[in-house]
Every structure is written in C-alpha cells, then in structure tokens.
From Swiss-Prot:
Keyword field: Hydrolase, Nucleotide metabolism, Nucleotide-binding
Keyword Nucleotide-binding (UniProt): yes
Quaternary assembly: Homotrimer.
InterPro entries documented for this protein: dCTP_deaminase (IPR011962), dUTPase-like_sf (IPR036157), dUTPase_trimeric (IPR033704)
Protein function: Bifunctional enzyme that catalyzes both the deamination of dCTP to dUTP and the hydrolysis of dUTP to dUMP without releasing the toxic dUTP intermediate.
Active-site residues (renumbered): E121
Annotated GO MF terms: dCTP deaminase (dUMP-forming) activity; dCTP deaminase activity; nucleotide binding
Source lineage: Bacteria, Bacillati, Bacillota, Clostridia, Eubacteriales
Full protein name: dCTP deaminase, dUMP-forming
Underlying gene: dcd
Protein species of origin: Hathewaya histolytica
Family, as annotated: Belongs to the dCTP deaminase family.
GO biological process, one term: nucleobase-containing small molecule interconversion
Length: 172
C-alpha cells in the first residue's frame, strides 16, 4: 500500500525524514524532490564495471545547462531523506518525462533504513535545458510485510553528494 500525502506528513520525523521539507512540495501520494546544482559526468566513453570510472563535476548555472542526448548525467536531490519501516521509491514527475527527460534508469527503489541524498541517473532523448532547484522527481512510500533487516551499511548509505557507480567494489 502506498502512503497518502497526508500520511507522509503525519510520519515526518518519526519514520520518514525529509530535510528540508516544504508543504508546497507535498502531493496527494508523494513528495517532490528538487535537483541540486551539482552533476557528474563520466570522463570515458567506455565504462568498465570492474573498475572505478573517473567522473568530472559540472555545476548547473542559474541560467540553466543544456543537456546532450546519449550522455549520462549523475545528479542528486537537494533533499536528504531517511526512511524507517517503509520502502521508499523514486519516480520522475510526469511533466519532466513529457519533455523526454529520464531521472533514473534502474535505481528508483530504496531500502528500508536508507539515509542520504538520492543520486539521479539523468538522460535525455533530445537536447533540453535544465535548471537547479527544479522539482524533478517524487518520492513515495510503500508499507512492507514480514520481517526484514534494516539497511545500514550499503555502499551508498550516508552519502554526502552525487554518487558515481561503486559496482567495482562488488569485485573486491
């Protein structure tokens, strides 16, 4: 079952933590998250799953940044979230998707206990200008049934910014 917007607000600072929080970003069954001004792009055209892939930092200026199709941009949310006893899910906003902008490729699923900023895998189908601070995606919450182990030590837990892939650590 998905929580309503009112239930998300009722659970704030209990088992849902969103910082900063604004009532203006609350929806009937989700909460809009905003795009930070920092992006990462990989430096190599060919990426290797078994190796750390170098990335360079780009800052989105207030006047916007033109994204190129066929290029992966890693961004992050302004909001830091933490979730207990619920499964957090991330989706793009339909208004953003209708412009041909994807905000996650496969990683829209969070773990119970995840704490950090959400890294966004941003990809566009045609050139598009993006801006910092826009409400780019939404988080929503599912109840979980049965016993579970809390997520506390994953490689992306307690991140402090945009996270490139750390898949290479699985091979160590």
């Amino acid at each position: 079952m998905i929580l309503s917007g009112k239930e998300i607000k009722n659970r704030l600072n209990k088992d849902i933590f969103i910082e900063p929080f604004s009532d203006n970003q609350l929806n009937p069954n989700s909460y809009n998250l905003r795009l930070h001004n920092e992006l990462l792009v990989y430096e190599n055209n060919v990426l290797d799953m078994k190796k750390e892939n170098k990335a360079k930092k780009i800052t989105i200026p207030e006047e916007g940044l033109l994204l190129e199709p066929g290029k992966l941009y890693l961004g992050r949310t302004i909001e830091h979230t933490r979730t207990e006893k619920l499964v957090p899910m991330l989706e793009g906003r339909s208004s953003v998707g209708r412009l041909g902008l994807f905000i996650h490729i496969t990683a829209g699923f969070g773990d119970i206990g995840f704490s950090g900023f959400w890294t966004l895998e941003i990809f566009c189908v045609q050139p598009i200008r993006i801006y910092p601070n826009i409400e780019i995606c939404q988080i929503y919450y599912h109840n979980i049934e049965g016993e579970y182990e809390k997520y506390t030590s994953g490689k992306y837990q307690n991140n402090t910014g945009v996270q490139p892939s750390l898949l290479f650590k699985d091979f160590e």
